[in-house]
Amino acid sequence: MSNTGIERVLSVHHWNDTLFTFRTTRDASLRFRNGHFVMLGLHVEGKPLMRAYSVASANHDEHLEFLSIKVPDGPLTSRLQHLKPGDELLVGRKPVGSLVLDDLRPGRHLYLLSTGTGLAPFMSIIQDPDTYERFEKVVLIHGVRLVSELAYADFIERELPEHEFLGELVRDRLIYYPTVTREPFRHQGRLTDVIESGRLFTDIGLPPIDPAVDRAMICGSAAMLADSCRLLDERGFHISPRQGELGDYVIERAFVEK
């Protein structure tokens, strides 16, 4: 297990009965790009049980943070949901992923399209100063079923704009657009529906997405990913064909169902 180290849980926050965040220590030698994921897990019956988790903390943070659903009979999540401070976790030492800014062509606006725990990699990206150096506006769209699933909403709306170093950039350039499908909320509807109907752009005061000036990153369920890619493709966007090659939008290829 030379590619895996042991980290200690620092804190756990349960957003509701299906969603939680946990923070761990971070080995000083671990380096990653914002948007990357690592393998994470526990020893179960003497063997490592590992799954891929996007890092929700920024690469300049001294800790690691992860966002997870709770699956009652899930081999790993059924155990992770009972984590408490002081517990040990296995964390991979080789962060990887295709959801990175470097694979996007230059543009004016960056759209971060997420559903559910697909928000996680974008939490690191919106805390990266480089994101705001590259784009005039950064639009974070988070689609969920229930209001209680809007993880990090208070942090995004209240804490991040007051951040000592990032605050001014965030206030000037970040637009947060949470949308809910199964409860009353100020924005309602599926992520792809608010884009296709044009409601998103009316609400945020930007023109409809245009491949000449706009770029996108997508992370969410397999169905959401397929629908979002189709939506962008139909509008003339071109996906980054592989890691290291530029495109109008990127997805996390490792999470795509084969």
Residue positions per predicted region:
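Ferredoxin-reductase
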Residues: 2-87
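Ser/Thr-glycine-rich phosphate-binding loops at phosphate-binding pockets of nucleotides
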Residues: 115-121
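Conserved S-adenosyl-L-methionine
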Residues: 107, 132-138
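Short helix-loop-beta connector
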Residues: 104-109, 211-212
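Reductase modules of NAD(P)H-dependent flavoproteins
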Residues: 2-3, 141, 148-258
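Short, Lys/Arg- and Gly-enriched loop/turn segments at beta-strand edges
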Residues: 46-53, 96-104
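Conserved beta-strand elements of the Class I
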Residues: 110-113, 217
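Histidine-anchored nucleotide/phosphate-binding helix
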Residues: 121-133
